[in-house]
Amino acid sequence: MSHSVIVQSLVVKPVSLILLCLCLGSVAAALSGCVTEYSGGTQMSADPDATVEKRVSLARQYIGVGDWENAKRNLELAQQIDPNSAEVFEAFALVYQSTGENVLAEAQFQAALQVDPSLSRARNNYAAFLYSQGRFVEAEREFKRVTGDTLYSGRPMAFVNLGLSRLQLGEKKEAEAAFTRALSMDRRNSVALLEMGFLRLEAGDTGEAARYHSDYRATAPTQSPRGLLLGLEIARAAGDTDTLSSYELALRSLYPDSSEYRLWEERQNR
């Protein structure tokens, strides 16, 4: 079983999907276990736009703590004021995606982008949704559009997600270009560093792969299963049996139920 088979056998989730609420900013992180509500029905402010914004903000907080019913309640109140708010549609999409109602989620994402095609956060989340459904061609197309927005704060992560989509399509050269762009904007992006390590190793450049892995370890003191797998592959390619044994022990001890460990074990048994 070749290295490339191991790499391609693992579907790496796009970053925004891993975090789910990545594009909601730091809302969830700012919560301290409670959500501050407002009273007075929909009359939170004399300014309708401000009221919608507050309701959507509340909904995002509820999404951050997994309270889907209160999230939907606030979004419904916001929609009573502005039936065509892209922000409301997007937040509804995140709720439905989280509750496994994928048809509804997609409809809401599409509604958001129809109202405001320039809302890159919504497009990035929609692309992550498509990726989660295995619709990699569509995801790649949407992530590519997101990366074209030079003012989008999440652009470096969008390049990472673009690279991950291209990997799933077997477009390794194009994936490497996307990861390189991501690293030019954020040199400490652990996902891009890790995937570049795999790509360089597969290209036969063990030294560069080791450099990327070293940079990855500097950003991730506790390595992920995929990080340990890269360490294993580099050690194997370099003939470093001591390091290989060390990484194998770490992968077996820390992540015995991981896909990476199962794949490594299958490889050793062939």
Regions inferred by a protein language model and the residue ranges of each:
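Structural marker of alpha-solenoid helical repeat scaffolds
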Residues: 47, 81, 115, 149-151, ...
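Terminal, low-structured helical/coil segments at or just beyond the last alpha-helical repeat
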Residues: 38-43, 218-270
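Register position in tetratricopeptide repeats
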Residues: 64, 98-99, 132-133, 149, ...
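Canonical tetratricopeptide repeat
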Residues: 91-94, 125, 159-161, 195, ...
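Bacterial Sec signal peptide processing site at the extreme N-terminus
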Residues: 28-51
